[in-house]
Every structure is written in structure tokens, then in C-alpha cells.
Amino acid sequence: MKQVIVITGASSGFGALSARALARAGHTVYAGMRETAGRNASQVAELEYYAAEHHVDLHALELDVVSTPSVEAAIAKIIADCDRLDVIVHNAGHMAFGPAEAFTPEQFAQLYDVNVLSAQRVNRAALPQLRKQGRGLVVWVSSSSTRGGTPPYLSPYFAAKAAMDSLAVSYAGELARWGIETSIIVPGAFTKGTNHFAHSGSPADKTRAAEYNEGPYAGLAEQALKGLAALEPPDADANAVAEAIVSVVDKPFGKRPFRLHVDPSQDGAEIVNGVADRVRAELLRRIGLEDLLRPYARS
């Protein structure tokens, strides 16, 4: 069944790959990104060329996830165009790399804004439509770092992604009775095929960072990145994340997985998440809320 889908952070990386893959699968896709007439104008042109060349229903959408007016306008446009919205893909995110102490509190807040509050802005704008329809799907692009191995120097990103994952889990139960499903996609560390690492932020406090990088932790940054790259199999492909999202969207209502891991490096997140998700399910059963584990078919 053809779905109307919005993806945040779709100018590059998993978002761009997923937008194209979902459009190829026959869906109407709105690829959200900021500054469509500015810094991302070339990405918009590439997307429009791709849509025309492949004859798919794919559209660039001005959507700045840190701006409530921008988010509200974007969602309103989709509903005006299509009279519905079926799937939200929370993909927008930004990485930062460096010693935790060298990042200012303001930098932590900014990462939290992009990685966590952005999803809340989109949900507040879009969920009323999904609830009205009595059916929908919310896909969250999480990270294996929330429960798997955590190499050093990525603390702002890890903390934000952990918060996002917790938000996704909480929303799942609160949306089930509205007929809205939740699927959490858990990518591992893909050092190739995305700009995640290349475009990562750095600490604002250069003096504090230097104390680490020129002191007992000299060379650690290079060692950590080299180690992550070495763990990644040669055939690891970021397109696998896009394919996982397509597979979830294309499954029938009630058959979509709550969590799906795409982690070529196998950092242990699947094991820990399996335990955590089972504990969650057991608690809901113990307090008489087992029905929240599955969406209720309302339409």
C-alpha cells in the first residue's frame, strides 16, 4: 500500500538514502531538509533529478527541525498536498567528537536540540493527523551506541541518542491505542557511506581539548576512529539502513518489529536491547497494560 512519508534530515546520509529507497518502493516521500534554497540547493537539485529520472514520487521539503514554525509549516504542506500523512521517520541528527569536558553546556544543549527536541517538534505537528486517521507509523533512527559498546570522545552524541531512544520507547506505549505503530531502527557505526563522522562537531573549548589531546590521551582520537573503521566489515553498506526502513514500512499493520538492528560491527547493542525490551514488556504485563505492546487497529 502506498504511504505518504516524511523523513527529517534527508539532505545526506541515511536520510537521503532512505528517501530514495522509499520512493523506489512506490511511496510518496517528502525529504525534509533545511535551507533548500541555500546551503542545500544542490541536494535539492540532485533529488529532483533523481525523482524525474526514476519516475518516483519524491519531493524536497523545507523543514528545519530546530524551528517550530518551520516544522509546522512543513507538516501542514504535506497534509494540504496529500490530505494525509502515514509515516514519520525521525532521522535528523548530528554528531560531535572530542573530549566530553571540552564541550560547553551550550554545545550539549544544541546536540540535544537536533537529536531529541527535533523529534518532539515533529511529533507535536504531525501526530494529531495520524491520531485522526487512527493509523500510522513512527520510525526512529536510533544508534547502537545507546546500549552497545561506547568508544570514547562521542559523549554528546551518545547522550543525545540515548535520550532519543528513551523517548521513542515511551511514545510507543502512548501511541499504541491510537493505532500508531513504533519501529526503532538501530544502526551501528558506519564510517563509510555517510558524512556522519566527516561533518561531526568539535569542542568549543580548544584549550581544554588540547590538555587531553596533548596529555595522557594523546593519539586516542585517531586510535578510536581507526579501531571503529577496522571493526566495520569491508562489505558494510549504509544502504542497509535504508533497506531496513523500507522493509519496516512495507510490512502489514501489526507485523512491524519494535526494534531492528543494522550493525555490521556487532557492538553488543542487540543483546542488551533484547533484555531491556523484554523487561519493558514484562513490566507492562505485570501492571495490566499489556495491550500497549501492540497497536490497536482503529481503521
Model regions: which residues?
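Conserved glycine-rich cofactor-binding loop
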Residues: 11-12
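Substrate-binding pocket helix/loop in short-chain dehydrogenase/reductase
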Residues: 99-100, 107-109
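A short, exposed helix-loop element centered on a Lys and neighboring polar residues
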Residues: 123-124
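C-terminal beta-strand-loop-alpha-helix "lid" module of Rossmann-like NAD(P)-dependent dehydrogenases
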Residues: 181-231
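Active-site loop of short-chain dehydrogenase/reductase
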Residues: 2-3, 84-85, 130-143, 178-181
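Catalytic loop of short-chain dehydrogenase/reductase
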Residues: 139-163, 169, 173-176, 188-202
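The beta1-alpha1 cofactor-binding region of Rossmann-like NAD(H)/NADP(H)-dependent oxidoreductases
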Residues: 61-73, 105
